């Protein structure tokens, strides 16, 4: 049984297992939509798409982690004004373009996490149809533990949470750490809640994102605290259909 119910945005969440905070955006209830309980909007019917094959030259997934990730205080390099990251996933690949001026603090954090391969082998553990695809808990418990309290100050919101935009999840004001979501539709309702986008998925890549397995949703998804304390084996055992990031690497703006 899950330990937590999804909670409303900007409500502080208790510490789970070894201290992993539950960070997630929750869609506002709109007059024209009547979601059940706190669930996001109902799923939209997606057209069938064909997975994009990964190029032969793509790097192999790492079987362990970069030890530098155990010291978040040492990973504070300033990101370029603009950079790109290629994600190779179990559904294919997509490219993210980050514009630092949109959200400098978040863009710098993402840059350092990518440089040190934080997201390699991590899963899209929360995919809510017609809302968001969320990732950012490490496949490795020691890494998750190291970043649990590495909070960032909030960036001002300069861009709307449009479809394909990347934004840090949060457990309240100034609590961003490593979790990120990709908006699956225009989520302008998140703008006033302080969610500051910092990057965007390329248009062809959204065909890949739209294919991420979404049938667990919120009701039957994994517990964030147990992801943090047990890592990828916990997800593989209980939620084997979740899609995974094989590698996430800088390809421009290094």
Give short role names for the model-derived ranges.
Residues 17-254:
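Cyclophilin-like peptidyl-prolyl cis-trans isomerases
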Residues 1-18:
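Sec-dependent bacterial lipoprotein signal peptides
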């Amino acid at each position: 049984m899950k330990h937590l119910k999804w909670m409303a945005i900007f409500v502080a969440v208790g510490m789970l297992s070894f201290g992993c905070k539950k960070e997630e955006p929750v869609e506002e209830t709109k007059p024209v939509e009547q979601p059940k309980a706190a669930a996001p909007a109902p799923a939209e019917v997606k057209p069938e798409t064909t997975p994009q094959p990964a190029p032969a030259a793509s790097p192999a997934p790492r079987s362990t982690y970069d030890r530098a990730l155990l010291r978040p205080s040492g990973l504070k390099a300033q990101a370029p004004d603009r950079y790109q990251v290629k994600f190779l996933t179990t559904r294919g690949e997509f490219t993210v373009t980050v514009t630092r001026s949109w959200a400098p603090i978040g863009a710098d954090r993402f840059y350092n996490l990518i440089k040190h391969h934080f997201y390699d082998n991590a899963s899209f553990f929360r995919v809510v149809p017609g809302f968001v695809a969320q990732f950012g808990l490490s496949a490795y418990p020691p890494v998750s533990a190291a970043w649990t309290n590495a909070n960032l100050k909030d960036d001002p919101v300069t861009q709307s949470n449009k479809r394909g935009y990347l934004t840090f999840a949060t457990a309240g004001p100034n609590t961003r750490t490593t979790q990120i979501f990709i908006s699956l539709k225009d989520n302008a309702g998140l703008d006033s809640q302080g969610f500051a986008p910092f990057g965007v998925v390329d248009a062809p890549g959204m065909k890949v994102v739209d294919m991420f397995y979404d049938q667990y949703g919120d009701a039957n998804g994994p517990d964030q605290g147990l992801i943090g304390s047990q890592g990828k084996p916990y997800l593989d055992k209980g939620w084997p259909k979740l899609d995974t990031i094989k590698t996430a690497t800088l390809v421009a703006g290094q």
